[in-house]
Amino acid sequence: VMWILDGYTVTDRYPLSQRESLETMTDDSLQDSGGFQTLPTDEINYLRNSVKVTVDAYDGTVTLYEWDESDPILKAWQGVFPDAVEPRSEIPAEVMVHLRYPEDMFKAQRYQFQRYHVTNASEWFEGSSRWEVPQDPQNDKKLQPPYRLFSDVGSGDTWSLTSVYVPRNK
């Protein structure tokens, strides 16, 4: 039995990029709010799912696997700790079939897409075409979580995340 976790590289110092609260971007009615206490700052402007982590449930062995091979922050850490992260090619096939797109990454991207989906400059500056993730009908203080879908798309079973947007302030 293995636990699989997603490892992220984050910073608040990426040039020419707006900072946002990670908690705000990932908060919804299903989110446990205790996970952000280990971050030195909640505001980030760079987020990559750079590492997949496995934890052996029997003996506690932790293995880090490089997932995003082009991440410069991960490359810097690998320069300091060269043996800490295994190459992506070393991920066992029986683990690879269980890897999923990270939900927190999806939530951060959907948060940004609310504003940055607009391609017309005047509409972007006016904010007239902005979207928002709707509130959860069962908890009006929290956002609706993404839908988790498992379906057969012809080429086999597929797991996916999807989300709904509504026009902002309408």
Predicted regions, residues:
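Accessory, solvent-exposed terminal regions and/or long lumenal/extracellular loops of proteins
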Residues: 73-170
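Exposed beta-strand-loop-beta-strand "reactive/processing" segments of non-cytosolic proteins
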Residues: 1-32, 36-54, 125-170
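Extended, regular secondary-structure scaffolds
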Residues: 2-6, 19, 25-44, 49, ...
